[in-house]
Regions:
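Cell-envelope/extracellular polymer assembly enzymes that use nucleotide-activated donors
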Residues: 6-8, 39, 185
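Short, well-formed alpha-helical segments that are part of the catalytic scaffolds
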Residues: 16-31
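Donor nucleotide-sugar binding loop of glycosyltransferases
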Residues: 16-19, 47, 76
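Conserved donor nucleotide-binding strand/loop of the catalytic core
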Residues: 41, 52-90
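A conserved acidic beta->alpha catalytic loop
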Residues: 44-53, 102
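Conserved catalytic loops of nucleotide-sugar-dependent glycosyltransferases that act on lipid-linked
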Residues: 75-80, 84, 103, 131-237
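Short beta-strand-to-loop acidic/aromatic patch adjacent to the donor-nucleotide binding site
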Residues: 92-103
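Conserved donor NDP-sugar-binding/catalytic core segment of glycosyltransferases
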Residues: 110-132
Length: 238
């Protein structure tokens, strides 16, 4: 293994004791079989259950591949940004973000990885099976981004995306540290940036393996309203 891997997998984790063993077992097996040199960075975001203890057990078993850190709770978006910034700072060519609830299925990773040379940003295009409310929320978000921001993002909030760190570095400094729904903001900034090649991979998106969403639907809607206010302040000046 090289000191600097080819891929950093960023996985925010919050109260996922019901799913984390299943998720790590599947993802480590898939990544091992892919042939890429990777590290999986699990950022434990102040869980109140025994998630961190389970992560530490996994790290003891796979120290060469799994990195674990814990911190006070700051939310999913800020956890993702922390991982992206670390990938850029370490000079790692690619960063993959997945979630720890079992909805990001490892079986689709190979389809993403094949596109990395011809696309700078690759999003999962979800065939959602986790409820009509989430389906409507995704559709409304895409429409609102088209109308209000003038960008078409396939699935701006999808927790399954492969990005080149070179592309991320071009826009990361313009994404505020405390912004709500940080993945949405990053997707918008990347879409606005000239020269970045975008792609998508159709993915199944099953119900959560266990636990509860870190952002319930009513809070997601409130955050969506807030992020459009924040995006307005991030628009390029004429």
């Amino acid at each position: 293994m090289k000191p600097t891997p080819e891929l950093l997998v960023v996985m925010p984790v919050y109260n996922e004791s019901a799913s984390i063993n299943h998720v790590l077992d599947g993802w480590l097996a898939e990544l091992d079989g892919s042939g890429c040199d990777y590290r999986l960075l699990a950022i434990e975001d102040g869980s109140t259950d025994n998630t961190f203890a389970l992560l530490c057990q996994w790290k003891d078993e796979r120290p060469e591949r799994l990195e674990v850190r814990t911190r006070e709770n700051r939310g999913h978006g800020q956890t993702c940004l922390e991982g992206y910034r670390e990938a850029v700072a370490r000079g790692i060519p690619y960063v993959l973000q997945i979630d720890s609830d079992g909805q990001s299925l490892p079986v689709f990773f190979g389809d993403f990885w094949k596109l990395r040379k011809t696309h700078d940003v690759i999003y999962g295009a979800r065939s959602r099976k986790d409820g009509w409310q989430r389906i409507i929320a995704s559709a409304v978000l895409r429409l609102a981004l088209r109308v209000l921001e003038g960008v078409d993002c396939v699935d701006a909030n999808v927790p399954y995306r492969l990005m080149s760190c070179e592309a991320c570095a071009k826009v990361m400094a313009r994404v505020p540290q405390e912004i709500s729904l940080a993945n949405v903001a990053l997707a918008v900034m990347l879409r606005r940036e000239k020269g970045i090649r975008h792609g998508a991979v159709p993915i199944d998106f099953p119900p959560r393996f266990g636990g509860e969403p870190s952002v319930p639907m009513h809070r997601f809607l409130a955050k969506a309203v807030e992020i459009f206010r924040q995006l307005r302040g991030m628009r390029p000046q004429p």
